[in-house]
Amino acid sequence: MLDDCLVSVEWFAVFPTDPQWVPSQDREDAARAVFEVLMGADIEVKVNRPGRVVLEDAGECIETIGCPACGTLVGENPKAMDWWVAQLDRVWTDSGGFWPLDVTMPCCGVQTSLDDLVYDAPQGFASWSVAARNPVYAMGEEMLALVGAALGHPVRWAHRHT
């Protein structure tokens, strides 16, 4: 634990594209096994089943948040994050987490989901994830597809520095 205080820690998380989707135990085990092989030997891997929708965030790596319809920036870190934070507060419940994710964009009035906003760096919402601490390898699209195939559902990712 002392190393957590002395150096930055990276987490690379993979999670289903549907925020409420949770795999069967067999699919979870298969996806974890594939993920562990792809991430490298001796890497700490953890599975998260929080029982509600959580934000798999990019941490301090998040730079901008954009509208998926018109491209307008609605958030820029560290300034101008008020609208996005207010939306997170609005949808949060203790029982469901961040659900429902419906939002009306302030720029163009389009109805969309907080999960569909354009995040730079990538992040999203999930009820299940698998994550590697300080991974040895970067994961490309082909590797993500392998994890998704083992999971039985398409996946996305978030890379967080803490």
Task: Report each predicted region and the residues it spans.
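Long, contiguous alpha-helical scaffold regions
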Residues: 122-162
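N-terminal alpha-helical interaction blocks
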Residues: 1-65
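Short, non-ligating residues that shape and space the ligands of small metal-coordination modules
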Residues: 75-77, 114-118
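Short, flexible, solvent-exposed loop/turn segments with mixed acidic/basic and small polar residues
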Residues: 1-6, 116-124
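Aromatic/basic-lined ligand-recognition segments
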Residues: 103-104, 113
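Charged linear interaction tracts used for macromolecular binding and regulation
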Residues: 68-85, 93-96
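Short linker/helix segments within small regulatory modules
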Residues: 85-103, 120-121
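Short cysteine-rich clusters marking metal-coordination/redox-active sites
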Residues: 67-70, 105-108
